[in-house]
Amino acid sequence: MSDPRPSQAEKHKLGRAAAKLKDPSRTMQADDYFARKFKAINGSMGPATLNTSSSSEGGGGGGGPANGTPAVPKMGVRARVSEWPPKKDCSKDLACKTLWESRSQSSYESVTSIIQNGQNDQGDRQPEEQLDLDFVEAKYTIGDIFVHSPQRGLHPIRQRSNSDITISDIDTEDVLDQHAVNPNTGAALHREYGSTSSIDRQGLSGENVFAMLRGYRIESYDPKVTGSFGFPDFFPCDTAISPSLHAAAQISRGEFVRISGLDYMDGGLLMGRDRDKPFKRRLKSESVETSLFRKLRAVKSEHETFKFTSDLEEGRLDRGIRPWSCQRCFAHYDVQSILFNINEAMATRASVGKRKNITTGASAASQTPVPVGPAGGCESPLGSKEDLNSKENPDADEGDGKSNDLVLSCPYFRNETGGEGDRRIALSRANSASFSSGESCSFESSLSSHCTNAGVSVLEVPRESQPIHREKVKRYIIEHVDLGAYYYRKFFYGKEHQNYFGIDENLGPVAVSIRREKVEDPREKEGSQFNYRVAFRTSELTTLRGAILEDAVPSTARHGTARGLPLKEVLEYVIPELSIQCLRQAANSPKVPEQLLKLDEQGLSFQHKIGILYCRAGQSTEEEMYNNETAGPAFEEFLDLLGQRVRLKGFSKYRAQLDNKTDSTGTHSLYTTYKDFELMFHVSTLLPYMPNNRQQLLRKRHIGNDIVTIVFQEPGALPFTPKNIRSHFQHVFVIVKVHNPCTENVCYSVGVSRSKDVPPFGPPIPKGVTFPKSAVFRDFLLAKVINAENAAHKSEKFRAMATRTRQEYLKDLAENFVTTATVDTSAKFSFITLGAKKKERVKPRKDAHLFSIGAIMWHVVARDFGQSADIECLLGISNEFIMLIEKDSKNVVFNCSCRDVIGWTSGLVSIKAFYERGECLLLSSVDNRSEDIREIVQRLLIVTRGCETVEMTLRRNGLGQLGFHVNFEGIVADVEPFGFAWKAGLRQGSRLVEICKVAVATLTHEQMIDLLRTSVTVKVVIIQPHEDGSPRRGCSELCRIPMVEYKLDSEGTPCEYKTPFRRNTTWHRVPTPALQPVSRASPVPGTPDRLQCQPLLQQAQAAIPRSTSFDRKLPDGTRSSPSNQSSSSDPGPGGSGPWRPQVGYDGCPSPLLLEHQGPGSVECDGTGEQEDLLEGGRLPETKWHGPPSKVLSSYKERVLQKDGSCKESPNKLSHIGDKSCSSHSSSNTLSSNTSSNSDDKHFGSGDLMDPELLGLTYIKGASTDSGIDTTPCMPATILGPVHLTGSRSLMHSRAEQWADAADVSVADDDPAKMYALHGYASAISSSAADGSMGDLSEVSSHSSGSQHSGSPSAHCSKSTGSLDSSKVYIVTHGGGQQAPGAVTKPYHRQGAANKYVIGWKKSEGSPPPEEPEVTECPRIYGEMDIMSTATQHPAVVGDSVSETQHVLSKDDFLKLMLPDSPLVEEGRRKFSFYGNVSPRRSLYRTLSDESVCSNRRGSSFASSRSSILEQALPNDILFSTTPPYHSTLPPRTHPAPSMGSLRNEFWFSDGSLSDKSKCADPGLMPLPDTAAGLDWSHLVDAARAFEGLDSDEELGLLCHHASYLDQRVASFCTLTDLQHGQELEGAPELSLCVDPTSGKEFMDTPGERSPSTLTGKVNQLELILRQLQTDLRKEKQDKAVLQAEVQHLRQDNMRLQEESQTATAQLRKFTEWFFSTIDKKA
């Protein structure tokens, strides 16, 4: 009791008083109000002196504590002492209570007068401290009195609200549950609607003192007296702290954290006169109490509340002690376990009940602002049941200033208007200065296949669950869900384990579960290890969950024995702060595990209720919205999109407090499910309407209690602001505004306004986009509201409620479910069988913990490149994730899959980790601990496939060349043997991550090349390839999950697969073409085992696709390398569109057939299938001229195994496309000509190096060049590039390129490459979709350096067909089965499927693209396949139509294209297709009747027929519309000279896809299905074109048309495509005349439209989709009619049967009568 300083409470009171001086009238009014309340509740407790008008009460300013004795309340403390449960260490409260009873309200004045009279000197400190303590304790007493007053019976906690969040689990008798009455106002806390749930967070802690002061702040001083004082006199505070009124105001506003005897400014520096006094001693001196009081105390004092925090702060200030962190060797199970802090648990233990009732949710925004004086703060409006705590609301929050036409900036709320994405701290193009997008949130990010930071939860992912785990992050990710809560259920429940409960003196009630399990460590062949799984729970909401290897625990017992270690030693090591002595073994009752499940899973809820308010034009207020009696058509349309209307009466699923028995809450409501969640919407217009009640309480009682509310605005509605809403429960508003309602162009804008303490949540709203009405938008919105609800539960209000509930559960367990047994120290586990007598002994190893499956944690400092700052973080590395949690915000700021880590550069105290495409994370250890970095590197070696980087200084040769090619991804595609680069150690497949200290991830390909060309000294940091020569790639590159996954509706038909947004820019790769490409399908390097995804990977792995034409620039400036585009993972939903390769792990972009489209396939799950697919897809027969190139490498191997016959090198195929535009220059860089035959050579069959694999596919545009003199590849001579309208991306044009024949060597590579490329190019076309017809040929140009010459011919082949059409055939690995519906459903229209590139979901039967495996691969097999496909039975897939349709055989096509081209011969020589081609089955594209050019004739290719397809089986085919797979694949052609050249073309992009290949056959002209809805004029044009087949141009045109038709058929053809097709018709010469040098122009022509192409395509697709939907509707109607007829027929049949029976009976009777009559007569 010796603290000589003024108490915090005094200062607080004074500060408030100062604020009040300005407005005496208001003060009096308020005081009267409070006095009345006070008297009402406490009977005689409040003396008349409470009236502020009585100046005598002031105590004359100088009065001391003796100033008057207040009447003691007879029903006050004394009457209720018996109610206060005794609690140890509680003496202080009683002391205060007694003090309170002995003094009057005037004691408040005494405090003021003491200070006013200058009693601040040392001499007066003792009494002053006494006053302080009395004062504080008195306050507690008041709080207790209120809580335990007779009003307690009104405790409304159980009826507080209809919300699911109600704390009904809390025992009403709980001493902490004292919120029945608000101590500040004396009013019952139960409120109406929204306010019902505001939790009055006022407990028995010292905070009540300040709350009381606010309630009676003026009563104790006489305004006349105080008015005469100058503020300086009035506040003679220590000048070091608050020498001015400003400081006083700060104190009153709570900006100083107050603890008696201490001051913290901003929680930082210790301020106070007794700072010199040891922190602990100060606290100790203040807590002296008598034992009597201690026994009667109900709660610990304020000082004890802060005791631990104070110690902590002292430690930080004086000794720099780090915050608590778990043992390094403990492997955390999930993110929240890493955030577990036992210090916080101790610090908050006594403050669980110390919660002030504050205004929350929308009510905080709508509160009436109060004039602010010098020391002012917010006051609650009179009559409010909530007291606005000035400390909680220091300055009125002004909001974030973000407004638009949907939502206005609002105090206490934060708005999301678009463009807000996940925080990015790594160095990548997105946050580099050169990033042009300027948007932190792109389409891709909103549909990212990556787990968002807030979506990361469980870090320990079992090997067998990894593919499934990855599947879960597809599409929109559910965030802020503690999935780790299932830890106990998964690892303890139903298994032998031990539970211990107890009440720790520092931590309060605790519960520990521990289990010893045997863990097989695949890395340790010599034996198994034991693992201890631990779950440690305190009153904090975070739980310590994880495991520790037995070898990592120091113990007196031997490790690895059957007996195990003493549990006591394990617990003492893991949680040294826990008092083991307090623990008792849990009772052997089935209730114990059940209670623990409830406790752990308390925060999990998969049922949410969402309010929907309807805002008409001109409206904005709550009342107006509630009073809209009925819904308008726009709102009805929106509701129909969002969910299904259900009849409430008898409804058995989640009803969200709606009446399902008597219809008292309306007859119908809106219900839906999303993922694992059930959502019931409280729709304002479906709830009961009361004409005489403007407040519409029947509606508001539901919607006002919903945490998340959707505000639907019609056009013309005023911007929404939470200020207009009165509810403490509504924390998040999702505003949806409709545009063009009830039209075909209906679309929606979305905005969000969330309470400031609700953390941000996804999916992010892309900037400047509107969402077309689609399933994608529905999923986006549902994910948004689910995440909003989950995030809101992290706000202070709900956390406080959950914490109280949790504490009650724990207390119950510790008191009622324990035995007397303590923690066993004998190390005997009853569940360990004695049978295993052999004592496995695993010696304790150093760094044993680094082999743990869970997340090992280190304290690091990370560089935030987004904000150019260093942040302290916790680094966690598990077997699945690497993540960073910022210490200050406790938020995950970075996460990536361990499979995405490709390498690292480690220093003594820092490490730079590279992941995915070379993005980099820079970390340094805290306190320069080099041991941490060593451990981190070791851990990375164990859990990732990366390696240490190598720095090289490269020299130039005499020509200034560096001697290698690099593609757009930074992967070395070719190295000149024995050149300087080769001697320095650079090898094919190496990945450049830094060039001259600049991160490659931040550079475009052009910038990369410029750096390499212009730097005098070229220093590069490279990541070496895998042992098999394949480049290191992130799993997300190889197995990118499609941005938009196919979503199947309930009927199994895919919902529209369309981009969810409407935007002018192309959706595909939005910001950075280069990047996307990367992800694109580069094959997975590395061994199959590499990733779980592996199989997929492997496929992908097959090729390193060269950037393949990544070089080429689309008109919009983006580079669309086919491969990139097609497979780039980032292509947004549509981005990869057909390509989707992105999807596949295979990641092999171009060639790999693998690219499974199916998102599913992407996941490993598909892997096996994919592999099969690939294998199947591979053209076994195809002869890869050389050993199969690495492209396939892994798959190739498979394929080869399957079809040993593959002779042509797959890489060729893959190259084809690339080469076309590969930069000729690239060759320059190489300078060596070796590359020319590198194809065969480098990619020898065994060679993983397949250029494709390597990514050799050169970036088109010579990007491959080391940058030396690469010139962007342009089409060389253009043979007559075919512009496929659809851009069938006729790769074949590539063939033309060859025609160039300019480089024979090129040709060599090309043929195969061309093919593969093409197919894949078309896939790419998706990228092309952006409008560039995409010179596919560029792709081919990639030819590994050899092509460097970039034979012009290759370029020409660019057939600009927009790649988009996408070759993306997808073959599902499923292999035997047809993709569902692929074949059968016309709807898919392969075109559509292919096109889904754009992200459409197919509306009808098309199988989900995800399934399709890679069809793209064709390009890989591409040429072969294509050719073979052509040959293959066109009809294989089954549609005669498609057969008919199929395109010319490749040979013919080639001949037509370049009848005399020597290249052809060369190509042929290379492929020697016929001979080599084995009759493997070609991939069939499933023929849908619609596909126009499905394969035409088997042609000589029959042999190739055995393309993968067949192997794959129809189901593999993703899109059935096209001809059989084989058609999909580039057909193989005989080496016939002309044919050979064609080989690489990929024919049409999706539309024609395989058809294209078939198209070659001049004999048959494909006829589209009449139902296809083709434009006959186009058909006629096509026919004419056919007639002119002999001319290459015509042929090109024809192909064009065909592809165009195909697209149309697919009905996915975009408008631009159509237009393009028309243009082509108009100017056939257009496609052919492109100048060889105009490769770019070539692209551009088609491409010029590219900027708008995507939008056009999207619109077109939407139109098509609508048509399909209309057709579907009609079909359904017809079906209904037919069903009705059937019903009638059944009824007629029954009637006839009845009549027949009746007639029979009558006949029988007649017969009987007749015979009986005769008998009688007889």
UniProtKB/Swiss-Prot annotation:
Residues 57-66 have a biased composition (Gly residues). Pfam families: PDZ, Rap-GAP_dimer, Rap_GAP, SPAR_C. Residues 384-403, 1195-1218 have a biased composition (Basic and acidic residues). GO terms for molecular function: GTPase activator activity. One of its GO terms (biological process) is presynaptic signal transduction. Disulfide bonds: none annotated. Residues 1091-1103, 1120-1131, 1220-1237, 1331-1355 have a biased composition (Low complexity). The modification Phosphoserine is found at S149, S380, S384, S1030, S1245, S1461, S1472, S1478, S1488, S1549, S1552, S1591. Residues 951-1027 form the PDZ domain. Residues 1652-1712 form a coiled coil. One of its GO terms (cellular component) is glutamatergic synapse. It comes from the Eukaryota. CDD domains: PDZ_SIPA1-like (cd06745). This is Signal-induced proliferation-associated 1-like protein 2.
